[in-house]
Amino acid sequence: ESGMGKTHLLKAAKNYIESNFFDLKVSYMSGDEFARKAVDILQKTHKEIEQFKNEVCQNDVLIIDDVQFLSYKEKTNEIFFTIFNNFIENDKQLFFSSDKSPELLNGFDNRLITRFNMGLSIAIQKLDNKTATAIIKKEIKNQNIKSEVTSEAINFISNYYSDDVRKIKGSVSRLNFWSQQNPEEKIITIEIISDLFRDIPTSKLGILNVKKIKEVVSEKYGISVNAIDGKARSKSIVTARHIAMFLTKEILNHTLAQIGEEF
């Protein structure tokens, strides 16, 4: 799936190899970039095609992101297959990412699928709330946001964007822009965040009611709806309960009296 962090992971692998193995030559490109280069070189002479293959094979590590973009391109696949074999025969490293597992990839020669399956395949799971929160905090630091962002505000962002790394980074960029425009605000609260992202909740949650809000919040925090409705005072449950109550007020415009009855 898009936004799961595949590109980030491959770039991290590239940076790690280059930082720790100085003698290794690494080539990183997207599947689309490789396909465009192959299509261009196929218009040229046989000698130039072989030269292109040799140039790629001079690398010790080849990393291709979104390899599915090479599907249904017969001539491009032939070039790719030759390069793939060369790396295997010379005991070199190959890293690929795709939007599905090898056996589900269509538009590739069976020989390539077999070779894909020879390697180690790892499915990247959707982010959990803890990981999403860690990414948000790191991105806030990377973007050098001066204002303090409260934990409730961070949880609010995590609740809506924990399924997409790109959206997480985009949301922090939006927050950064707002912070630069409002330097007098030293603390960014959940109230500020909810106003800043007021265009999100309806499309994200669909038909809204208190039950739906409780279900979404409880799922994100890994607790039951009964826990939100109960009297337990553990930190995670209290935070989830407060988030659900706040969303009920902000999204459904319920009064405090109504919220008291519903929680």
Swiss-Prot record:
Pfam families according to UniProt: Bac_DnaA, Bac_DnaA_C
GO biological process: DNA replication initiation; regulation of DNA replication
Stretches the record annotates as Domain III, AAA+ region: 1-179
Binding site for ATP: 3, 5-7
UniProt-annotated stretches for the region Domain IV, binds dsDNA: 180-263
Location in the cell: Cytoplasm
Record keywords: ATP-binding, Cytoplasm, DNA replication, DNA-binding, Lipid-binding, Nucleotide-binding
Keyword NADP: no
Gene Ontology CC annotation, any one: plasma membrane
SUPFAM superfamilies named in the record: P-loop containing nucleoside triphosphate hydrolases, TrpR-like
SMART domains reported for this sequence: Bac_DnaA_C
Residue segments, region Domain I, interacts with DnaA modulators: 1
Disulfide bonding pattern of the chain: none
Source species, domain of life: Bacteria
Region described as Domain II: spans on this chain: 1
Record bears the keyword Iron: no
GO molecular function: ATP binding; DNA replication origin binding; lipid binding
Annotated family: Belongs to the DnaA family.
Record-linked PANTHER family: CHROMOSOMAL REPLICATION INITIATOR PROTEIN DNAA (PTHR30050:SF2)
Summary of subunit composition and partner proteins: Oligomerizes as a right-handed, spiral filament on DNA at oriC.
Domain notes: Domain I is involved in oligomerization and binding regulators, domain II is flexibile and of varying length in different bacteria, domain III forms the AAA+ region, while domain IV binds dsDNA.
Role played: Plays an essential role in the initiation and regulation of chromosomal replication. ATP-DnaA binds to the origin of replication (oriC) to initiate formation of the DNA replication initiation complex once per cell cycle. Binds the DnaA box (a 9 base pair repeat at the origin) and separates the double-stranded (ds)DNA. Forms a right-handed helical filament on oriC DNA; dsDNA binds to the exterior of the filament while single-stranded (ss)DNA is stabiized in the filament's interior.
Protein name: Chromosomal replication initiator protein DnaA
